[in-house]
A protein has these predicted regions:
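C-terminal beta-signal and terminal closure region of outer-membrane beta-barrel proteins
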Residues: 57-65, 112-146, 250-258, 273, ...
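Conserved small-residue
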Residues: 58, 75-192, 321
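Outer membrane beta-barrel strand-and-loop segments of large Gram-negative receptors
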Residues: 4-5, 31-78, 171-174, 187-191
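Outer-membrane beta-barrel and related beta-rich outer-membrane complex signature
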Residues: 37-43, 92-117, 222-251, 326-336
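Outer-membrane beta-barrel signature, preferentially recognizing the C-terminal barrel domain
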Residues: 1-26, 55-79, 131-139, 193-198, ...
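Flexible, solvent-exposed coil segments and beta strand-coil junctions
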Residues: 4, 8, 43-55, 67, ...
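Extracytoplasmic gating/loop element in the C-terminal half of outer-membrane beta-barrel translocons
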Residues: 161, 220-315, 319-321
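Membrane-embedded beta-strands that build the outer-membrane beta-barrel scaffold
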Residues: 12-20, 25-33, 68-76, 84-92, ...
Length: 366
């Protein structure tokens, strides 16, 4: 396709680097504004479904990324036996589509629709519009759970008609956003996105004589994930696969404080088949990424004269990875994602989480 070109990016930065206190303290600060245009993506509008071919790749749209990064490092040797260091970084990112690149028939800006559907149960959950971030979740909002049949029956439109005619106590209450008296795709709203607003990490280490200990923490803030696995794990009680133990906490007349809808065989209210923000969760986290303890045995090794002549070294260490995670996310791992497309991240269908691991090693140089 001779009309298809590479994506183009323009970026400007404003930075500041400082070294203070005889280089014990270093600071790096950077503000950036990046514009990426002629994005390469599949044509999602004006492509007839009857043509029998997949939609072609086209250049369309413009994305902006604006934010700042900050990093600080401090290291010091207190005496010949003791030294330490502390390091941390923090970044903030604001992302939005500044030009969608397509128009509707009436001349208004179009949208990019990402699939993100889950099996045959949940339809598409993504849509990106001009002024919205990439990876925007496009969902029907909920307003709690009906606590009685009377409350469900009283949820009516301006004409007195029930908005959710099949709802009873224990069902989700969906927001009739467009006010037409029914719950459908017209009630979808932009509900955030999977891209973290902030990312951060900090690490530190101490060395006392031959013993060294170091640790690194890493995390994100403002990220969201659509935990679609709840559709299987918390829905009807029949089937040939295990449910989550949290299903025991589903709403009932004796457990009215639960945020899990009631158990039912056919789900007449669509609690689990409606693409709603009930699936959407805060995926912010703080993780102990690495902890390492090491001991230098070189002095013992060099007691042999030929090892001393060669200045040989010996160190043993024990290292742990992904030792614990602090998060409000109810899934296995707030970092996992089923989807890999740029327009469909942040879907969690209980993909395998990052594993915890331990490594014992020996570093020997002769």
């Amino acid at each position: 396709n001779p009309n298809l070109t590479w994506e183009t990016s323009e970026q400007w930065d404003l930075g500041l680097d400082l070294d203070l206190f005889r280089n014990r303290l270093s600071l790096q600060m950077d503000y950036f504004d990046k514009r990426t245009f002629n994005l390469i993506q599949t044509q999602t509008m004006n492509w007839p479904s009857t043509i029998g071919l997949d939609a072609m790749l086209v250049n369309q749209g413009e994305v902006r990324n604006r934010g700042f990064e900050f990093q600080a490092n401090w290291s010091d040797r207190v005496n010949k036996n003791f030294s330490y260091y502390i390091s941390g970084n923090f970044s903030y990112l604001k992302n939005w589509v500044s030009d969608i690149g397509v128009k509707n028939a009436d001349g208004t800006p179009g949208v990019w629709v990402g699939d993100g559907s889950f099996r045959s149960t949940l339809p598409y959950v993504y849509q990106t519009a001009e002024g919205q971030p990439l990876n925007s979740f496009y969902l029907i909002k909920t307003n709690g759970i009906f606590q009685s049949d009377e409350e469900a029956a009283a949820y009516v439109d301006k004409n007195g008609n029930r908005i959710q005619p099949d709802a009873v106590a224990g069902d989700l209450k969906f927001v009739d956003y467009n006010g037409d008296g029914k719950i459908d795709d017209g009630d979808r709203q932009y509900c955030g996105n999977a891209t973290p607003k902030t990312t951060f990490s900090f690490s530190g280490g101490i060395t006392y004589k031959k013993l060294s200990v170091s640790a690194m923490f890493q995390g994100v803030g403002g990220a969201q994930s659509l935990y679609v696995a709840k559709c299987m794990l918390l829905s009807d009680v029949e089937g040939n696969f295990n449910r989550s133990k949290e299903i025991l906490n589903a709403w009932s007349e004796t457990n009215t404080s639960s945020n899990i809808p009631r158990l039912s065989k056919n789900d007449p209210n669509g609690n689990f088949t409606t693409p709603s923000d009930w699936y959407l969760e805060d995926a912010s986290y703080l993780r102990l990424k690495n902890l390492t303890v090491s001991y230098d045995l070189s002095d013992y090794l060099r007691k042999w004269s030929h090892m001393k002549e060669r200045n040989s070294n010996l160190m043993v260490y024990l290292s742990g990875e992904n030792l614990f995670t602090i998060t409000n996310y109810s899934g296995y791992d707030p970092e996992v994602s089923k989807e890999s497309s740029i327009l469909t991240p942040g879907i969690d269908d209980s993909s395998y989480p990052r594993s915890k691991g331990f490594v014992f090693g020996i570093n020997l140089s002769l």
